[in-house]
Amino acid sequence: MKKFLRKPQFWLLTLGGFLSTSVILAACATPSNSALQTVFKARSSQFFNGEQGSLQSALTTALKNPVANKQFIAAPLLKALEAWYENNEDKKITQFLKDTKSNVDSQYTTAVDKVVSASRNKSLFVQQDLLDNAGGSEATWKAQKLLEQLISDFASRVFQKNYLNYKKDGQVSTGPFTYDELHKEESWKNFEFSAPRFSETNDDFFAKIQSQVFDQWVEYTDPTLISQVNYKYSAPSQGLGQIYNREKLKDKLTPSYAFPFFAEEKDIAPNQNVGNKRWKQLVKGEGAITDNNIGQSGTNSQKTGLLKYRNESNKGDFLDFPLNLSDTNETKQLVDASNIVDQLEAANLGAALNLKLQVFEQDNDELPQIKELKEDLNNTIVVDKSKDVEKASKTNALFYNDQEGKQQQSDSDPIAGALDDIFAQNTSEGTNLSKLAEQVKKAAATKMEAKTAVLRTNNSKGQQNNYVVLDAAIPTFNSTTSKSKNNSASNEVLVALKSGSINLRQVQQTDQNSYSPIKFRIVRNSTGVTVFGLDGGSYYLKQDSTNKKSVSKQSLTLLTKSSSGNSNKVLRDLDKQKQFLKFRAFQAKTNTFYSTNFAFSFPLNETLKSWFDKHRELILANALVNASLDQKDKASKALTEAFNPYKELIKEFAPVALATTMISFYFDQMKALNNKLLERARNLNQNVNQANPTPWLNGLSAKLPYVNTNGNYEKLNNYFTFLITKTLWPKVGQEETSISEESNKLKTKTADVDKIRDKILENIQTKVNDFVKNKLKPALAPRPAYSNVILLNVNNDKVLSSGANWSLASLLQSDKVNPLSFMLLKQAFDNNDLFKKAQKLFKDIQEKSSNNGGMQSSSTTNSDADALSKVIGNYYYTTWAKLTDKSIYGNPKDNKFDELFKLAFEASIDEKSFNVDYKAVIDHYRFIYTLQWLVDQKLKNFKSLLKTNLKFGEVAFIAYKNTETTNFSNPQGVFGSYFNYENSASEVKESTQTLDPNNFFYKTTTKPTVQAIQQVASLALVQKQQMQQNSTDHYGFTGLSTSTSSMFDASSRDAILQQITKTSLQQYGSKDQLKKIIQGTNNQLLLDRIAVQLSGLNPSTTNGGSGKTIATYFQVDAVGNPTLDFQAKRKLLLDLLDQYQNYFGNGAQKSQRDSTPSGTGNYLTYQNGSDKYTYTQFTYQDIDSLSLTTTSGTNNKIASDVVAALLLFQAADKGTQQLALSAINKPQLNIGDKRIESGLKLLK
């Protein structure tokens, strides 16, 4: 669309022009006049006039911000820390304080020196550039720098030692420690953070801080120990070429996730215990810690298989794997909710969260269940779904044959059958992997042409596709105990329990074929196969407050779900979780293991310090509120006395602030989780979607078995929702289960999670607003000389005032769009009458679009919103098109692109999220305002713009690019590939490389072609035929093109303009109109331009003209002078026009069709290589007939939805927006802080 009118920026974007004026300073002031011009003249004693600009509202906004809130606590913390350092008996610590203060003084001097200005202006620019954003004074600047250095040093001191100890009879024990004693649950109450028996100065204080940090870490992040064994891929003795196609794969063929293999036991050297050797021992349960081993009577000795490694005899729900059964030297990994996405690779991450959700009895993705673990790993990752597994489906197994799906048919798919190239021609191995190879070869030979990797459809020849590849699965146990047969090991012992009262001996009398899942996961990942479970995962669970009875250990540890009649909800028991983690951490600290074969690491101090460093101020504030410090210690007493005046305020605010920060963080982690799994898919798609696809290089790479809906792995994200609702929401409000739950389980749909978030944000707003209003009561503080910012006085307390001003400075950073500037601009829009109409118009558009599913077939449009709703997807698309990663919202369902684009659009303008894109929201406001301005009074302003910029006689056209393409569901693979590595609920059917996704998705509902017309048709008939074909969306719309602007390349644009010039004079209106122009002009250049165009046309020999030809116009005499003067030339043109009457009106349409055989109806075509353009000429005379309302029989040349599409393009034009906004009344913006003005400029 042509970029019409470049007017000056509208009033809201040039606030500096009338607000940044000088103020009259006191007589003693010395800065120059030019320097004084930088002093902001406040027009309000608030941040801006209006409720949201009040001092209270601004401070509330800062204190609920996850980044700015910690600054409020910083000032009281500094006072407490300074007292502790100053009164410490460790002279090194007191000296550090002195040195740091001296260092801060030097930093301040250096910072002042870096402020470049004349000496007389120094104080002015120091105030504005240095002090305004640090609380307003030299003292607050230095205090902020001092805190940064003190709290960093403090953290290094607190976590220098590990203070977790074991107490016997109230005394710290120095050992020796035994596993028999420590592993008993009754001993765990003796673990605590305390000073060692032979302590040093500050050890007791540091231990108490560590204890508080540990408690917060457990509560806010749900730490988890994953117990695991790993088995690495390895090549067979004769090389991978005996399974895979070495000739095709070449150097890519190495044991890996794409080309998995595990050497058979017979190929492993006798002196090595790796891979399949270890695996065989694992599935038999060898080397496990049993009750008999530790002198206990219990159930563990009665188990077999994997369950032997799960020890519950002491109620700890231990899961311990021997080191000698793993190919890696670690069998435990510590993760928590704050780092799990970063710590685990995608395959392990998905399985771990799936298992966590199973333990919490929340909805999770269904995984295949392995009935029996084979003794060969190759028969574990590839299984026969007809007998080896249950619940295998197309969403959780690669190469799944969907017997219920519709048969796909494709004779032209270039990649169909390509998986045949993965495997060698002859696979002699007898494993399931080789049987899968045979299956793929046979499928290719029988020409199964399903688009989704050969094996997705029914085989008309009866091909049985039983072998599937698993990426994650759940092992099961059988209800009976049987002997090991052939190459399999049984892991059956127990059945699903309805009640914890059933003892194990009774349980064994059950049906032979009953398989129940156990709480382990088997994962195929980048390095091999991992088997893991959660260590202690069910020990620290409890039922909710409606029933405090402990959850049955058997039902929680062994079974997937409680009985269907159980309405109790499972929550974490924080005390037990802390006890269990202390036990494991102390084991690692003291190397007190059952044996060295069960050793593991537990990096407690590193983990706690990492957690502390992320939220230092908030965590330390909570710690000081709750810690009972020794008042006999001089430093602790001084800290307490300094902190006490603020303790109650911080006790009320700090938990809310930390919870707010973590809630925001966990919502971000949902996005990070989505991105991690999608990034894995993107990497796999590269080999499929390139110009010359090589899908065989992906080998047996598969989609992970977690369903992606609209770009979200909703059920995996449910883990973070669980922590947010059950742990954090109660700190800022009260969970409303009517919003968060359904049938006693958390809702998982993204729309439902958004409602949970919205309610939490409401609670945070209420909580913080009440705190500010009732406890802080901010007032205006005196403004320092030359200052440009508002400073607050909180309770007449310098410390609290500094914290408040630091928090505001963090919120109002000059290089970022801030929420207060956004609120002011939003307020200005909301108070405008035309904007109110614009909001209603857009709401009507969305409602009509939703009611018709975005696919409107009716040709009648009764209102502006009717027509615009047909093409509103073009506006949504502009948001989606800007995304760097276009896969984050998933795939279109049934090619309904608008629904996908709308998701991206709505997310971008969401004003309720923790991370509002203020710029996107304001851009949307400008757009709908401008749209209303263009639409108002029957398109008055739109038509005026067109007439101003499209001159009479100028050639222009409306065009579509490749609109007739049928294979366009996934241009250039932007929606992934048909292998569906994303595991999207909406699968991509195909991929093509010929379309440009950058503008292809603009559309109209009117089809730009009609059936061929043999005779000159009336305009009404043409329009009627267009309407009859108005049945679906027609993509490739490129808007209005002129000689200076077009959405496609210049060569194609110029060729079409030239084609129009050679076939039409419609740009001049009618023949009579052109005659009037010729008769009335004295412009030689105009006459020459008309003559040149006539010379390119074929005149009619049957019309008038008395034998005259246009060639006469250009004749010259012997010396090169024109033989005709101006008057003669004008008369010649007038005489000749009758010969060209077929190039006007309907005659021009016939002429164009006749000269271009491919032209049909009102539209013509132009071919440029593989691109086909369908276009129709647009003239000055067409402007007045433009309308958004159309009824049957209307004779408008341009259909109403096409007009609507043009309007959307025009409303998005920045120049048009400036023109529209400059037309409204300019309200007086009364601002009291220059940072608000700076934020407005960033919203341009």
From Swiss-Prot:
A single Pfam family it belongs to is: DUF3713
Cell membrane as a keyword of this entry, yes or no, is yes
Query: Any coiled-coil ranges, and where?
Result: none
Keywords carried by this UniProt record: Cell membrane, Lipoprotein, Membrane, Palmitate, Signal
Q: Which range is the signal sequence, renumbered to this chain?
A: 1-27
Q: What is its main location?
A: membrane
Q: Which domain of life is it from?
A: Bacteria
InterPro entries reported for this sequence: DUF3713
CC terms in the record's Gene Ontology section: plasma membrane
Q: Where is the lipid attached (S-diacylglycerol cysteine)?
A: 28
Q: What is this protein called?
A: Uncharacterized lipoprotein MG307 homolog
Lipid-modified residues of type N-palmitoyl cysteine are 28
Localization per Swiss-Prot or TrEMBL = Cell membrane
How does the record classify its membrane topology?
Answer: Lipid-anchor
Family named by the database record: Belongs to the MG307/MG309/MG338 family.
